[in-house]
Regions:
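Noncatalytic, beta-rich nucleic-acid-contacting surfaces in large DNA/RNA-processing enzymes
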Residues: 1-507
Length: 507
């Protein structure tokens, strides 16, 4: 896949829809829960509005409370006609109209000072520096200059000038540099475009670079879940592919062998050294080996920790044998004596499974042997792959479950809706079997506790699960991270992917 970013059109509907729907995991500046939530509220449709979004979701703007709500919320309400845009003076409208009357950028303060107080570019830049660096002493000096200049210009009264400058002073807590914000917005749009039009490449690259995140494991988990909601499934490492890092192979994303815990360069180097000889001996490439051929013809030539890790993450899947059975037979094979294993290498091609091979090298129980035969014929536990065990092993070795989602280890028969169904617009009552990723408890204005949940299943994730006070009091003991629950509720009309909870059952 190759294209020039400079050739991207900035009116691409698919890209803007992705942003407006909050599907911005991995999108520059907007990938957090906060960014996704406000992207859905702001619904930007051009670079200017996207720049505004980048600026108003910064902590200062979110914490700047005027008339009971943040400046961020004021922007959203005014943009969508919920509240009226009012200006302290008519002269401010040309400067603030594009940002819904909210003083979003430092450059707007500079322009106000130029228009109302006659500041030249240097004086306006001094104001910008005072705002950006929050220099109270410099701001006090500039305020005197501003009031004096405003009087000379005669556009506003002294009282209005003081009120406007007071507003500028308050904006120093949140006003952002517009040139920075525009450049961030362009990068955000580029990444949204890539995600909208080249999703496989997008997810592959972001997984590759997840190591630079504060919590790489959590980053990969979120990317894998987000990819599922777009019908893109990340595959476990595979000995058929032999890729070392995450790569796109046959238009599918595959984790690399080196991304498995307990597998390092030393183990991989030995695998590569011993592989050609074994492929020649077995008579076919590793991609065509059966599990039996791999076990007898190759497993003794590499580290046991490598085999255990590869089997546990599914790197040998597709050979018609469960992972549990592979590990069980590998353990049995390791317990044979060196002489027994050496003899087996000479005759194993006469058989097609470990049990038949063992019968040729060990006598029956009546003959004083058969211990390993009995172990293979009558295992002490089921060798089927239990989803809960697979999830646990993949989380242990990869940091994220790939084959199953965590909730698939539970009884989900009562569920009638998936996360993806909700994302795609399903209405009405819902029953969802999900894993809780996060719980955010808040207090209402009346002092009551309520909460918002982030959840996921095998189809994707949702961040807008609302638990009001009564439900919180009743179910809070089972509402915790990583718990699997059945959520019974209804679609929230105001939010495309919001759910209001009526009941919660632990599953």
């Amino acid at each position: 896949m190759s294209f020039e970013l400079s050739n991207i059109e900035y009116n691409d509907e698919k890209s803007w829809n992705l942003i407006c729907e909050g599907k911005t995991k991995g999108v520059f500046q907007l990938e957090s829960n906060l960014g996704r939530a406000w992207a859905k509220k702001v619904k930007p449709k051009n670079i200017e509005e996207l720049s505004d979004l980048v600026a108003i979701i910064r902590p200062g703007c979110l914490k700047a409370i005027v008339d009971g709500k943040s400046m961020t919320q004021h922007y959203v309400d005014r943009k969508h006609g919920v509240s009226e845009v009012l200006y302290l003076h008519d002269s401010l409208e040309p400067i603030l109209k594009k940002t819904q009357g909210v003083l979003v950028y430092q450059e707007q303060s500079m322009k106000i000072a130029q228009v109302l107080a006659g500041f030249d570019l240097q004086e306006a830049d001094d104001l910008r520096k005072a705002i950006g660096k929050k220099k109270a002493d410099l701001m006090a000096v500039i305020k005197k200059r501003f009031i004096k200049g405003a009087k000379k210009q005669g556009i506003v009264s002294k009282a209005v000038a003081e009120e406007i400058f007071g507003w500028i002073e308050k904006s120093s807590r949140y006003a952002f540099n517009k040139s920075h914000s525009i450049s961030y917005a362009i990068c955000a749009y580029w990444s949204a475009y890539c995600k909208a039009h080249h999703p496989v490449e997008f997810y592959c690259k972001y997984i590759q670079f997840s190591g630079g995140k504060p919590d790489p494991q959590q980053e990969v988990r979120e990317l894998v879940t987000d990819a599922k909601s777009n019908d893109i499934y990340i595959n476990p490492p595979s000995l058929k592919k032999l890729n070392l890092t995450t790569e796109i192979i046959d238009n599918s994303i595959h984790f690399g062998l080196l991304e498995v815990k307990q597998i390092g360069d030393k183990q991989i180097n030995r695998l590569k050294e011993r592989l050609p000889e074994s492929e020649e001996s077995i008579g076919k490439p590793i991609s065509e080996w059966s599990w039996y051929e791999f076990l007898i013809g190759f497993s003794s030539k590499v580290y046991a920790t490598l085999i255990t890790a590869l089997v546990s993450v599914g790197a040998l899947s597709g050979k018609g044998v469960s992972r549990s059975k592979m590990l069980y037979e590998f353990d049995t094979w390791q317990k044979l004596t060196d002489k027994e294993r050496e003899w087996s290498l000479g005759v194993y091609k006469d058989h097609d499974n470990l049990l038949d091979l063992l019968k040729t090298i060990q006598p029956t129980k009546k003959q004083g042997g058969g211990t390993h035969n009995a172990k293979i014929e009558n295992p002490c536990y089921s060798l089927d792959d239990d989803p809960e065990w697979v999830i646990r092993e993949e989380e242990n070795y990869l940091g994220v479950p790939i084959t199953y989602s965590r909730v698939e280890s539970c009884d989900t028969s009562l569920a009638n809706t998936t996360c993806k169904d909700v994302i795609n617009g399903r209405d009405g009552n819902v029953k969802m079997a999900v894993t809780i990723n996060a719980v955010r408890k808040i207090q209402t204005k009346k002092g009551d506790d309520m909460a918002f949940l982030s959840v996921e299943d095998n189809t994707g994730a949702l961040d807008n699960i609302t638990i009001f006070k009564d439900q919180w009091q009743e179910y809070k003991n089972i509402l915790y991270q990583n718990n699997n629950v059945l959520i019974i509720g209804k679609k929230e009309n105001k939010k495309k992917d919001g759910i209001i909870v009526d009941k919660v059952l632990e599953i």
